[in-house]
């Protein structure tokens, strides 16, 4: 291969155009006719030296190294603090100053000495330089000490002069006060004030001064000097004496300068003393312009009014300031910091020390805020935010009037399928149970029935375990509880729960033993079982009425109604029949054609169409009233359930309602309640999020989450579904209801489910067209239900699918090693006796020595009578070769096991 390099090849090597390379060669003094000419190594080095000189570098690497040895670069970093003013506060900022300096050693420095110095000479030179440096430092210290001494002497001299001036001014002030006190004696006419010794010279020149000459009298009035003036008060004379002394001039009573005349124009009725006093109040001296008094006020450079004024407006507190902070139900950290006059970070830091992790924008409850306030040294008081609630209470008190007897409110309670709704059907002579999905009641039904014994309002509550809150709500608003117990089934869990609700509400109990017409009915068993729940029948010496009835044939229904009427008479139920109405929401729903619908039970007053009412966090005007038959009554009195249309939203079941005079008050009360509820919910959600984070930190990634969106026809069903499904959560899976509501499944519900990968549960509702489109496009799991049993079962199945499978180990057999043989093919072979179960060649094994696992692996061979077998059962001998393990000893046990997958369930 030729070592010659052409210009073209060199241009390719250095990645430079051929024309440019030819130009550079020509500039370097080398002529070439074309790109195909050969370039020698000498010419290459010559070109390289030319290019280095052009760029300001050494021609050769040796020269570059020599130049680098003559240079030294020093980098210096210095940290310092700079104070920056930010408004009224000052902030300290850390600043890093970086300096870079390059020193070049000149050629004559190295050539200044022909021969290098000996070590002794170098040591002497270093000592001489050190002594010179020490002398320079000593001289500098002496110079600084001398300048400090001169400065201190100058400061001390100025302080002495200022103190002497203050002493002279104090002596002059005391002399002036004594002279003013002597001149304050009653005199027949005002006379000129006696000049003090210090003011003698200016007083002698006073007549020649044109500004001190008396002015001619003003037209239309006497001159101030000739007008009688009121006697000046002692303090006014003292002030005037001060100004006379400090101003070093004499003021004659009634003679004023031009500046004073301008200032008091239109106030000629004032005396000289009053003018002097007002001048002092305004902070301006009463002396003539140009005098020392008007120029500098007093010897200290301050106005004379400051000498007589009280303390200044702000004094730095010497003790910690304890503030009284008003805190509501919730408060944000930023608002609390503002009330405490602290930075938000300080409050957040105090919360962290107390174990509460919160940001500056997060809301905290009253107890936490009170604790951190006391921790910071201040006092916390509860803020009174019940302004609108007080107005609402005043409205309720105004509605008091004459009371009349009202119908009783009777709640039918009991276990599921014990015949509660069927009994009410017979009383109403209608069929209601057939209209309920699955034949069970899934929301509170409110009815009022006119019987021969008067009007009775009935509330039919669900008996399923999921509707605990509904039954508790029904017990709170009722007067009498009728406990329905099937004679053939006895006391069940929801029966006991209903008894507990009735006792907690303090409501009298009447037991209706239903299904008495069936063959297996045993009323005595029911009485004995209820006796364990402290419900004692009258024939057992108790006070509870037991009525045997049959909802199918009507046996004992009249006796039950008589018992209800008798109990109502004993209770003497009364209420105000006229005036503003108030009561409780029994159930609520969202009707697509009518809007929010609330079933309410009126407890006081009369509810009429057009009334403004507040219902929890909702408000509105009553547009229409409907009873359980669909008719529109003119009004609803006490103990009458009706449906109300016209609210701003769907209220929660169990909320109280009250009628107010105007819509403004109703809106204010509803908004205040909503604000409080939202703040409380934020505090609770923040706490739950923190608990979830801590729980996840402790559990790792083991817990699965199933997100749900629940929509139902009525509020009570939503509440029951949420409680029942969330209760399915355990340490392995968590049921999370991300959204719930009343009404059909809308587009926003579908979007929310798609974003969070949630399952939509529609209970007696359906999805609209837009929601179905989103569900289909995003693959959202949408399920419709009408019976609460099915909802719970389906969610259990879905949750169990998320749990996956559990791997379990099952021991199949155990072999006892009796002796160990050696094999050229397998190594150590254990002669064993199967003492338990069966040993299979395809299963994994463990080797146990003294009941301790020493090896885990698999079998390499399993033989019986020199034949390979797949398994050996209990009581037989065999030879076992363990794969990759030769340390088998007599007395060991070989355990054969298998791994099986078990589906996990809730």
Swiss-Prot record:
Major localisation: cytoplasm
Keywords: Cytoplasm, GTP-binding, Initiation factor, Nucleotide-binding, Protein biosynthesis
First and last residue of the signal peptide: none
Location(s) in or outside the cell: Cytoplasm
Binding-site residues for GTP, renumbered to this chain: 414-421, 460-464, 514-517
One CC-aspect GO term: cytosol
Keyword Protein biosynthesis: yes
GO molecular function: GTP binding; GTPase activity; guanosine tetraphosphate binding; translation initiation factor activity
Coiled-coil residue spans: none
Record's protein name: Translation initiation factor IF-2
Gene name linked to the record: infB
């Amino acid at each position: 291969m030729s070592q010659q390099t052409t210009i073209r090849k060199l241009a390719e090597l250095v990645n430079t155009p051929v024309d440019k390379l030819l130009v550079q060669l020509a500039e370097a003094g080398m002529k070439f006719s074309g790109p195909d000419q050969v370039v020698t190594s000498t010419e290459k080095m010559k070109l390289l030296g030319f290019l280095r000189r052009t760029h300001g570098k050494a021609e050769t690497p040796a020269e570059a190294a020599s130049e680098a040895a003559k240079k030294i670069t020093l980098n210096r970093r210095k940290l310092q603090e700079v104070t920056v003013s930010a408004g009224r506060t000052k902030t300290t900022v850390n600043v890093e100053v970086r300096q870079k300096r390059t020193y070049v050693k000149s050629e004559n420095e190295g050539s200044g000495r022909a021969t290098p110095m000996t070590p002794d000479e170098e040591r002497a030179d270093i000592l001489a330089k050190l002594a010179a440096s020490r002398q320079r430092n000593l001289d500098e210290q002496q110079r600084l000490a001398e300048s400090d001494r001169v400065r201190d002497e100058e400061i001390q001299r100025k302080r002495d002069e200022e103190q002497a001036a203050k002493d002279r001014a104090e002596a002059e002030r005391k002399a002036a006060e004594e002279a003013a006190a002597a001149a304050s004696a009653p005199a027949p006419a005002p006379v000129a004030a006696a000049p003090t010794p210090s003011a003698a010279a200016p007083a002698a020149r006073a007549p020649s001064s044109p500004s001190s000459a008396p002015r001619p009298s003003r037209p239309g009035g006497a001159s101030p000097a000739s007008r009688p003036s009121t006697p000046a008060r002692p303090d006014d004379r003292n002030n005037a004496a001060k100004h006379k002394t400090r101003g070093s001039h004499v003021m004659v009573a009634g003679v004023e300068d031009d500046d004073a005349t301008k200032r008091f124009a239109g106030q000629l009725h004032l005396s000289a003393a009053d003018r002097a006093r007002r001048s002092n109040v305004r902070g301006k001296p009463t002396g003539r312009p140009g005098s020392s008094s008007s120029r500098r006020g007093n010897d200290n450079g301050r106005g004379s009014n400051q000498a007589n004024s009280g303390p200044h407006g702000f004094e730095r507190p010497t003790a910690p300031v304890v503030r009284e902070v008003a805190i509501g139900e919730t408060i944000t950290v930023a608002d609390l910091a503002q009330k405490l006059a602290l930075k938000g970070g300080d409050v957040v830091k105090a919360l962290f020390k107390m174990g509460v992790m919160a940001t500056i924008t997060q809301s905290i409850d009253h107890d936490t805020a009170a604790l951190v306030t006391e921790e910071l040294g201040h006092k916390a008081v509860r803020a009174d935010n019940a302004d609108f609630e007080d107005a609402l209470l005043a409205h309720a008190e105004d509605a008091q009037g004459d009371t009349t007897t009202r119908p009783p409110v009777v709640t039918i309670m009991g276990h599921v399928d014990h015949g509660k709704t069927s009994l009410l059907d017979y009383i109403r002579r209608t069929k209601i149970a057939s209209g309920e999905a699955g034949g069970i009641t899934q929301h509170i039904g409110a009815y009022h029935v006119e019987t021969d014994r008067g009007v009775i309002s009935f509330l039919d509550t669900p008996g399923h375990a999921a509707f605990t809150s509904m039954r508790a709500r029904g017990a709170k608003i009722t007067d009498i509880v009728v406990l329905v117990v099937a004679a053939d089934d006895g006391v069940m869990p929801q029966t006991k729960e209903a008894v507990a609700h009735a006792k907690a509400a303090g409501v009298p109990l009447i037991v209706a033993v239903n299904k008495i017409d069936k063959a297996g009915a045993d009323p005595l068993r029911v009485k004995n079982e209820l006796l364990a729940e402290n419900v004692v029948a009258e024939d057992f010496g108790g006070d509870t009425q037991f009525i045997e009835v049959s909802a199918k044939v009507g046996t004992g229904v009249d006796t039950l109604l008589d018992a209800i009427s008798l109990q109502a008479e004993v209770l003497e139920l009364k209420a105000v029949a006229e005036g503003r109405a108030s009561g409780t929401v029994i159930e609520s729903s969202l009707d697509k054609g009518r809007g929010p619908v609330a079933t309410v039970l009126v407890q006081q007053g009369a509810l009429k169409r057009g009334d403004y009412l507040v219902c929890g966090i909702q408000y509105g005007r009553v547009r229409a009233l409907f009873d359980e038959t669909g008719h529109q009554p003119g009004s609803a009195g006490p103990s009458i359930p009706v449906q109300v249309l016209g609210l701003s939203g769907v209220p929660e079941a169990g909320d109280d309602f009250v009628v107010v005079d105007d819509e403004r008050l109703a809106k204010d009360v509803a908004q205040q309640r909503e604000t409080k509820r939202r703040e409380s919910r934020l505090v609770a959600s923040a706490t739950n999020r923190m608990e979830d984070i801590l729980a996840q930190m402790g559990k790792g990634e083991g817990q699965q989450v199933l997100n749900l969106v629940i929509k139902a026809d009525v509020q009570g069903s939503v509440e029951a579904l949420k409680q029942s499904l969330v209760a399915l959560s355990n340490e392995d899976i968590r049921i999370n209801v991300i959204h719930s509501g009343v009404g059909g499944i809308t587009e926003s519900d579908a979007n929310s489910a798609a974003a969070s990968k949630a399952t939509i549960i529609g209970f007696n509702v359906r999805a609209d067209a837009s929601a179905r489109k989103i569900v289909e496009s995003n693959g959202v799991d949408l399920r419709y239900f009408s019976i609460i049993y099915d909802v719970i079962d389906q969610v259990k199945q879905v949750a169990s699918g998320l749990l996956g499978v559990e791997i379990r180990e099952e021991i199949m057999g155990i072999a006892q090693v009796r002796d160990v043989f050696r094999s050229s093919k397998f190594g150590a072979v254990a002669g064993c006796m199967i003492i338990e179960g069966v040993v299979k060649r395809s299963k994994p094994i463990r080797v146990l020595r003294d009941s301790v696992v020493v090896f885990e692996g698999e079998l390499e061979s399993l033989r019986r009578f020199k034949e390979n077998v797949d398994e050996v059962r209990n009581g037989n001998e065999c030879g076992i070769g363990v794969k990759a393990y030769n340390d088998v000893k007599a007395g060991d046990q070989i355990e054969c096991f298998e791994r099986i997958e078990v589906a996990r369930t809730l």
